[in-house]
């Protein structure tokens, strides 16, 4: 059996849309950690969920297996593996992913954390800028938005409500 191109397989996995935020891909979110070839010839894709309790984890794994199997033409078994260390952080969202979120009315997490220990607290995005008008004069409406990883905010300048990805 020919050796598969792991970079092309990784690109196929990274192109899978996130089931909860379909405007971004798993690659945009930095969820696809590695693609390897197992001893038995199966392709294994390592995935790091955005947080341990993410309800989309199984759907993401199934979508990746389906996409990679289709990419390979069904010639190999495909497995996914959940990797929890290092823990996912919003720093892993690409600049392109942040742009896509903003363009679709979702405030991306702000800033990037400094190197060192990771805080064990979820920020509610007090500094979230409105994705419509850019104002930083926003208020928290609810700590929980349309998905568990978002909060609901409203802009004081333009009055629009919007989802904001919680900084982690």
Say what each PLM segment does.
Residues 89-90:
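Charged, alpha-helical interface segments at or near domain boundaries
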Residues 1-30:
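N-proximal, solvent-exposed amphipathic alpha-helical segments enriched in charged/polar residues
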Residues 79-86:
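AMP-binding/adenylate-forming catalytic domain of the ANL superfamily
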Residues 95-168:
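Cys/His-clustered metal-coordination modules, chiefly Zn-binding fingers
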Residues 51-76:
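Short, non-transmembrane amphipathic alpha-helical segments
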């Amino acid at each position: 059996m020919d050796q598969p191109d792991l970079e092309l397989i990784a690109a196929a996995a990274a192109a899978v849309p996130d089931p909860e935020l379909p405007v971004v891909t798993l690659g945009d979110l930095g969820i696809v950690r590695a693609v390897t070839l197992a001893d038995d010839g199966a392709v294994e894709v390592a995935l790091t969920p955005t947080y341990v309790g993410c309800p989309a984890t199984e759907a993401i794994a199934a979508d990746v297996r389906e996409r990679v199997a289709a990419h390979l033409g069904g010639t190999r078994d495909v497995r996914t593996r959940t990797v929890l260390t290092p823990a996912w952080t919003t720093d892993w969202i690409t600049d392109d992913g942040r742009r896509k979120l903003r363009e679709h009315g979702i405030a991306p997490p702000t800033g990037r954390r400094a190197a060192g220990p990771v805080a064990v607290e979820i920020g509610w995005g007090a500094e979230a800028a409105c994705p419509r008008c850019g104002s930083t004069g926003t208020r928290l409406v609810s700590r929980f938005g349309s998905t568990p990883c978002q909060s609901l905010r409203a802009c004081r300048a333009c009055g629009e409500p919007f989802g904001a990805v919680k900084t982690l």
